[in-house]
Amino acid sequence: MKLKKRYLLLGSTLTVSAALILSACASSQLNKGVFFTSSSADLLKNNSVPLSMFNVSPTSSFFGNAYAGLTNYVATGTNRDDGVNVTDQIKEKLVLELALSVTGYKKTTHSGLKGRAQKNGSTDSSDGSSKNDYTKFNEWDAIGTIYRDSSKSITEDPNYHKITQEATRYEFTINTSLSWVDNAGREVKQNNQPVKLSSKDFERGFETYILSSNLGFNRNGYFIDLMGLDVEKTVGMDKTNGSSDGNGKGIEITDENYDVENYRSVDDNKFNVYLTSPFPFFLSMMSKEFFFPIPHTHPKVKALKLGKDSPLKYNQNNNRKILDQANTNFDGIYGGGVNAWKDTWSVGPYYVESFNQAQIVFKRNQIYDAIITPNLPKTRQENEKPIPAIVSYFQPGATPEVFYSSYIAGGLSASAVPYSQQQDARSRFNGTGDLRWLKIQKTAQSAQVTYSGKPYVANDSTVQLNANITETEAKFLYNSESEEALTIRAGINGLINWKNLAIIDLPNSGDVNYSTVPFGIFKEKPANGTSSGTNTDGIENDYYYKINNNQRLGLIPEQTGTFQKDKNVLDTATVKLSYYSSTKTNGAQVRTASTSGSSSQTSQVSSKQVSVTKQSFISALKKVGFTGNNPLHFNIKLGNASLSSNQVDYYNALKQALTELGNDNGENLIIPEIILGDAQGPTRNEWYIGLSSVLGFSYWSPDYDGVGTWLDAATQLNSEGIGEVITYNSGSHIVRTLLLAASQNNVFNQIENKLQNNTTTNGKDWCSCITSADLFKDDPYVIKNFGTNGNNGTSASLAFTKKALSLLKFLVDNKVLKADKVKEAIKDPDKYLSKRSKIDDNKPANVSDIHIGYELKDLYDNAAQLNRFNSIWAEQDTDNAKFLITVVDSYFPVLPVSAPGLNETIPSLLKPWFSLRNAPSGIATMRDSGYIDE
């Protein structure tokens, strides 16, 4: 998908969200008009690729809102504190930035007009392009228009909800009065005329992002599938009448004959984006740097294609083109690296004045401030100006302690305060105005640790172990649905006192995120009991992730036994859960009556209560086959190249806790190891995607709003139904849960009939006839999230089952699952559910079986769309989201992670003449921050 934007266009983007690690190299005297900062990331680690493989720029993560998009988030208000506590916080608004308006459309229901459009083909565009203009012939009904408004967020517009729920075409009116500027902040001119922002700049931006992904260079290409982008209509080109393949057949972006100057966009001020179906997060997603514009008339932008004279080189691998990084000329790529920066352009609030091995310098874009800033919500106070310049030094591997010392020495404008230096900071900066207090309102992005999804790999037609994974470890990973594997994962999450460990890493932690969806994102029902859905009346709720009165709350139910507050291993605690399995009926058919007749199942599903204790945890390890001589190597791979002293202490304590938890009378069944990595560089694909080491590895979860988007990241499958790098087969586990719900013998017959006569109506059509469903009645997670005040397990099981049936229908209706195969599966659930549910010597027999979740592949009509429709369904109703979170989190696919808590105040240092505006996630938005020129 697209190679994009200004820094490195051809880049793989692992957006390292480090709440802006504010630090820098020592300098005896600060220039008050310059904001001095520093990054610990090694942005130039490998000069053979563009700036450590960020798609747009390595600075897009460390300099929030230095660039501009169709939409963006603006931070308004001021952070205030009383010297200890935060008294007022920044508010965040989603706004139109480079677009003046956006209109949402849905396909017209008037068949006559639609037929006219199809008959004519709409191929005659005003500029002679051979691309179809899909906006013509009134195929579309306008849903509504949102106009740029400096007083409010576009989410407050009365049309917002309807547009985002129904639109499959978005037409942005581009602000073509804005000029591109060069590295001196001057208007770029071609043919003596200023180069203005154009719809083609956005189309070219999308296009290079798609190309980058298709070449295997950008690991964030999943955004295209997630939003459901109709690539051909948005950026594709068609072959001409003279082509051997016939008129109208699309040419792939990776084809050397792809014409990058053949645009879908006909008018410079209109950019149309087409989706295959509505996606509620689309306008929010357009604030991501992947979709920012690049200047389509720039010679190096025109060169971003495959072909004889292209700087891009590729190898052919199984009929797929893969970027050849060793032979690609990155200096010939727009924004490709240090040597390519001297001729880059900008339309954002800052432009890059200079860039070398030691530092990068940003200057404020005066043209942006003249045209765009007055039309955005007001951010700065009357005595503040935009920060004129930003200088960031590169200090790879530097720790917070180094940055703190640099601030004291006068080399930095801002710095975090390490926990070990908080008392020093209080005394040293008392009354100076430097010490500020922040409070995180929500998590924008977090690094979680999950389990390897690739215990086996294929070597031609032979199944072999993945590198560094033992046969026993592969058995544990592969049979993830077994009682033993579930017990081990639940024990690691539930028998370690993660809260106690998190305290070690203060101020970078406070609460513990036990869930795939972190605090501050989930919207709970308001007090009146009505569902908030995607509306803004929900209450920010972090109830999953807190420990109150020494009891753990949320998706890990309260434990029995003593919590043992100051112990890292809770060896007297019990974590209760339900284990689900299927069994054949030994030839006897189970007949279930219904009003329309009767049908038979050849296997049944059942549940079993499991109590996870230290003893049962050890027993499960032994049952899998782990011993002192053949231990579980629990390798946690991190993206960090270095750790702070607090983090070193945290991970050492975690290693000790894992070792203690796995100790069986002096025999260590678990050997933990923390492996530092590199969040940048060409080896990252192997580091994360290759999963060439054992059990734990770090991944970045999403950094955009919506509970559904976080669920999407946890349930992603590819077109073959295989779990992607960040999922550990949670997607297939959800499908298994849906089959369990529909296979209950008092539910099966009704659903079989519904599948037989399915029509695309609403989910209630499959639920209204169900009056009893007891399979989940003892599940503590189901009771906690779907039970009544009396914790009635029967009613909770029924409510949970109805949600499962609603999602099952939604996935069938949207052609993610095949109705006939689902019918077959619930008639004989054991055929699908027993494949990886037994630990005893169960391993893949052939290469088609090596992937976790392979047993469900025949059910999918379009497996790659599972995560997308999970996220859409989750946003339709709060209880939908709660259902998916319950299913995923009770499967324990990720380890708990410490993070800045909603109730933690975090000290930081900032020179008194600056006013930083941090987004609710804690990330500084440089565009909105202020400078006080005294």
Swiss-Prot record:
Main localization of the protein described in the UniProt heading: membrane
GO cellular component: plasma membrane
Signal peptide from the UniProt entry: 1-24
This protein's UniProt keywords: Cell membrane, Lipoprotein, Membrane, Palmitate, Signal
UniProt keyword annotation of Ion transport present: no
Highest taxon, organism lineage: Bacteria
PROSITE patterns named among the record's database cross-references: PROKAR_LIPOPROTEIN
Sites of S-diacylglycerol cysteine lipidation: 25
Biased composition (Polar residues): 119-131
Lipid-binding residues (covalent, N-palmitoyl cysteine): 25
A matching Pfam family: DUF5396
Subcellular location: Cell membrane
UniProt membrane topology term: Lipid-anchor
Region Disordered: start-end pairs: 111-131
Protein name (Swiss-Prot/TrEMBL): Uncharacterized lipoprotein MG321
Species annotation: Mycoplasma genitalium (strain ATCC 33530 / DSM 19775 / NCTC 10195 / G37)
